[in-house]
Amino acid sequence: MRLSQLLMPTLREVPADAEIPSHVLMLKAGLMRKLAAGIYVYLPLGKRVLKKVEEIVREEMDREGSQEVLMSALIPAELFKETGRWDVFGPEMFKLKDRNERDFCLGPTHEEVFTDLVRNEVKSYRQLPLILYQIQTKFRDERRPRFGVMRSREFIMKDAYSFDADWEGLDESFNKMYRAYCRIFDRCGLKYLVVEADPGAMGGRDSKEFMVISSVGEAVIAYCDSCGYAANEEKAECLIESRDEEMLEIEKVYTPNVKTIEELVDFLKISPSKFVKTLIYKAKGKVVAALVRGDRDINETKLLNVLSIREEELELADGALVEEVTGAKVGFAGPLGLKGEVTLVVDSEIPQLRNFIVGANETDYHIKNVNYGRDFKGDIVADIKSVVEGDRCPRCGAPLKIARGIEVGHIFKLGTKYSEALGATYTDEEGNEKPIVMGCYGIGINRTVAAIIEQHHDEKGIIWPMSVAPYHVIVVPVNVSDEEQKQIAEKIYNKLLEEKLEVLIDDRDVRAGVKFNDADLIGIPVRVTIGKKVKEGIVEIKLREREEVEEVKVEEVVKRVKQIVEEKLRELS
């Protein structure tokens, strides 16, 4: 492809609304342009990268026996109403009516559609197991689209669903998809962690996310270098240490206008780990008091799961409700003597603490030497805390590390949630009708592209891994007015094409600096430069990922470039 003909509108200035490297570079390198908030159009280079990632996904899915289909993006409401998810998705779901006033949505996910297909087409155990997948556009009306394609309202996703006769079969399908995902992300040149995760609105169990470590990631991950344990913040646990202390008598302490943990630490000169804080919530019309150690935060996703409610059904209580429940102003809530019907949710660490300090449910007072079991008991004891750096790994006891990550893939076992709701059954060998056991497996194609850029860039631009680069090689004649440079460049370009390599030639009549800057910005892995030394029969080869330049004889350059490309592709295979 000739750059003089390629639609590649590079930018010199950073777009004002671009906050992270991948967003900046996808715009600057001319991969995409913004159409509206959270909606982008892909230009030729961007489309080629998407296609490369999609082909890697297809190859690895097909390798595990999956079959590709294509479902409708427009979904009738009846399917989501059958599973009860028409309302669960809330405002994120794009809903619309046709001319006959029938409800539809633009698909945010496709569990219902795949299950509907299978319930109509699969009847016998002989048709199982089955894994179907598609690569298709999804739609979610994000409240605040940001970070380019990281959180957009329209995105390309590979979603797959496995259908098995039993849980043992699901385990096998799950492991197939796990292997496929590892190969996909390895081939894309990504460094990633596989973490335990919360399945969210999709339901299910044994949920794992493929996380690309990045400082701009929206997810928080806890991981252990010693044993390999990794989990996102909604699932991360830590080892709880019991404290072997003699229980002391409780004592009320006057703490005038001392409301926060920080103020209490300063006032009482005691470590924050000796406090237990009580947060009052409204949860689906009921009052919940949640307790965690004073130096920790409540993880509200964990709390939602414990209470079996949706995100929009949980909110912190206002001052009036806090006073009604505690009889005190905000800042003095505790577990002893709460008024009315209050569900007490106690973090699993609290029973192991001794002689801790809580609010007295009386303005300007706290209580010392409180102990779980002796002085109060919870209605629910569960892990509702966020882990922090240095907490001990629940598996091996080594210190945990905390990092941010970009979720690029998610696999989980749905079980029979959707097959039972939609009546997707099969007849077993004895003639018994049983629900099909399902798994769900997703990869964000756009996100994967952005994650690759986050891990592979420098101050000059993108550094594409060979497997996903829009082109393998760019041929750059420094001066197209020099007939010898031009002819040699054209000859090399055509011979590389004959070798089935993907090649750009920068045949534009612009300064050499512009050509080199654009080549670095768009990140083509190999640059062949034809300059003044061509008179001596020498051209230069430079890899985007390195600073060194290799001088090669003109007659050897095609062989050498082909060798480099093949080596780089092998490294990622």
Curated annotation (Swiss-Prot):
PROSITE patterns: AA_TRNA_LIGASE_II. InterPro entries: aa-tRNA-synt_IIb, aa-tRNA-synth_II, aa-tRNA-synth_II/BPL/LPL, Anticodon-bd, Anticodon-bd_dom_sf, Pro-tRNA-ligase_IIa, Pro-tRNA-synth_IIa_bac-type, Pro-tRNA-Synthase_IIa_type1. It holds the Pfam family tRNA_edit. GO terms for biological process: prolyl-tRNA aminoacylation. It comes from the Bacteria. One of its GO terms (molecular function) is proline-tRNA ligase activity. The keyword Cytoplasm applies. Its EC number is 6.1.1.15. It catalyses: tRNA(Pro) + L-proline + ATP = L-prolyl-tRNA(Pro) + AMP + diphosphate. Keywords: Aminoacyl-tRNA synthetase, ATP-binding, Cytoplasm, Ligase, Nucleotide-binding, Protein biosynthesis. One of its GO terms (cellular component) is cytosol. It is found in: Cytoplasm. Consists of three domains: the N-terminal catalytic domain, the editing domain and the C-terminal anticodon-binding domain. Homodimer. Belongs to the class-II aminoacyl-tRNA synthetase family. ProS type 1 subfamily. Catalyzes the attachment of proline to tRNA(Pro) in a two-step reaction: proline is first activated by ATP to form Pro-AMP and then transferred to the acceptor end of tRNA(Pro). As ProRS can inadvertently accommodate and process non-cognate amino acids such as alanine and cysteine, to avoid such errors it has two additional distinct editing activities against alanine. One activity is designated as 'pretransfer' editing and involves the tRNA(Pro)-independent hydrolysis of activated Ala-AMP. This is Proline--tRNA ligase. It comes from Caldanaerobacter subterraneus subsp. tengcongensis (strain DSM 15242 / JCM 11007 / NBRC 100824 / MB4) (Thermoanaerobacter tengcongensis).
